């Protein structure tokens, strides 16, 4: 499986990049969200721990897209960018899953998986 790392400096840049991939034909089938409210973003070199990983296909090839600068668990710009990406990719979910800490465990960890 090929991999694209989206290490944008802002969540808005991440949204723009993902929208471009979607326009080029990327079809996300699975979205994995993993974010810790207490630890915030992982080190940039640990791309397997990025807050959003989209898995799907682009031109009949398997592709994983690791997105760095989006977050979850509160109402800021990072979580709103996550919502924008998930909506654009066609996932069904409740905004409150992303914009609140309702799904955080006692350590502040949020882990969600959506399928299309």
Regions of interest found by a model, annotated:
Residues 2-6, 12-22:
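Extended, alpha-helix-rich binding/interface surfaces that flank or overlap catalytic cores
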Residues 18-25, 85-90:
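Hydrophobic, Leu/Ile/Phe/Ala-enriched alpha-helical segments that form helix-helix packing faces
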Residues 83-116:
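Mixed-charge, Lys/Arg-enriched low-complexity segments
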Residues 3-8, 66-75:
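A short, exposed loop/beta-hairpin motif centered on an aromatic-Gly-Thr core
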Residues 51-71, 97:
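Low-complexity, intrinsically disordered regions in eukaryotic regulatory proteins
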Residues 21-58:
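Amphipathic, interaction-prone secondary-structure segments
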Residues 3-5, 30-34, 111:
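Ser/Thr- (and often Asn-) enriched beta-sheet segments in non-cytosolic proteins
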């Amino acid at each position: 499986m090929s991999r694209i790392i989206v290490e944008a400096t802002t969540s808005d840049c991440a949204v723009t990049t993902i929208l471009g991939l979607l326009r080029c034909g990327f079809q996300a089938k699975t979205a994995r969200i993993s974010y810790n409210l207490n630890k915030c973003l992982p080190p940039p070199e640990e791309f397997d721990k990025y807050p959003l990983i989209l898995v799907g296909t682009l031109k009949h090839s398997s592709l994983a897209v690791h997105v760095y600068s989006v977050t979850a668990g509160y109402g800021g710009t990072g979580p709103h960018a996550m919502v924008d990406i998930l909506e654009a990719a066609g996932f069904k979910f409740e905004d409150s899953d992303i914009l609140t800490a309702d799904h955080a465990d006692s350590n502040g960890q949020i882990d969600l998986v959506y399928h299309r």
